[in-house]
């Protein structure tokens, strides 16, 4: 269920395989093995570096994954996963620590934490969960590794070897993406694996259990079902059992078992919390109770194993809708149209409001806006004020050529949810598409307030296009440079900014603003150049920033 990278990959190793190596290099083994083998939640390592350095490493990883189209860069999805993550982080032992959450386009059931509090959740994991509490349990576990300083303890002896190893492996990704010599990525990767063999670092069994314990407490404090973590472990045991005709354990995770003791301990701790706090609980569903609404993944042996229902959430909850949204955005839209159409026709119980929304989204992305409108109209009657549904309707109307109705709906949504990135981005793009200078100015005005706290390249690209059509070429070029930086092309961003300084039409304030941005990016870009980590087509470092 993965989309091809935007840039052609000429290396023998695909970026996703190399990214898997990065995740594997940073993953922590789960201690003694017993009879229950489940995918480990894939915690990653941090080194003994400053918090700011850690954030830079984590941000560089995210930017490079974006450059290779490995991230679900969608404002609604970003808002949801970050709202969920920060709701948990706020109730953790370190509520003021830096965290950032994002979704990876990968059908593997996995999640990992990277330096600087960056936590990634694979699309495959989101799809396989049955409730928001189960998804929250995965994230809470990763937060637990960070808040309990497992990252620092695990690397106390190896100092900075592991994060540098991660950067070396990211360099292999870059080599594969940029078309550098065919054997270059393999050489980098082989060398990295050798270093890892010498500096093998794992989470201890105690660390894993402690992350579970802290995660369960965080779940309860944040108002989620503390039983969800153990329930998810058991669910994975069911669906990853080859003997049961389920999903094969992903190769990346085969060596990361979850012990029976760990499952039992999670159950016991959750039970104690429920008794003490009288929290709501949600019981796991047996297989014959599940609805077949999970998209097929590449490691499925029997499609009947992929059956799940949003337990404890109504069928039009944000969780249920975003899960379908992730399924569609992480895959090929025409393929998803066929999946939904076939399942709606042949699978009893598949037809739910959330799956109808997913079908409509896939139709719109496939250029069938009129059909998408037909799917969405009954849903709007169920929840007429649902922002996710209404935004989907606006997108469908725009695609179907109903521009007036689409713009009116975008405007109403923006008035009701000002500064919502998903609404503003869609509305701005629709305005710019009109080609009118006044509407382009309106689009730029919509997006400008979001630039102060946004790192989504789509926001900057859209603002750049709007500013360009509005006649403000300086702001447009600044925005395009920032879009390049956040897309994993830092050298390109620096070159754009330097070229801007040569313009004769810059006023004092514009020149000062551009120079300040160059000064801000220079140390970051120099560090990436030093490590040869960049997705720019710059294998020889010819665009080294002025020092």
Each predicted region: which residue ranges?
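Hydrophobic or amphipathic, alpha-helical segments that drive membrane association/targeting
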Residues: 2-13, 18-112, 241, 322, ...
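Extracytoplasmic and endomembrane cell-envelope/extracellular-matrix remodeling and assembly machinery
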Residues: 33, 41-48, 59, 71, ...
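Acidic/histidine metal-binding catalytic segments
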Residues: 77, 97, 155-166, 184-187, ...
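Active-site recognition of the HExxH zinc-binding catalytic motif
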Residues: 121, 137-145, 149, 211
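Short pre-active-site segment immediately N-terminal to the catalytic Zn-binding motif
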Residues: 123-137, 201-206
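Catalytic Zn2+-binding segment of zinc metalloproteases
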Residues: 133, 143-160, 178
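Membrane-active amphipathic alpha-helices enriched in small hydrophobic residues
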Residues: 163-178, 187-196
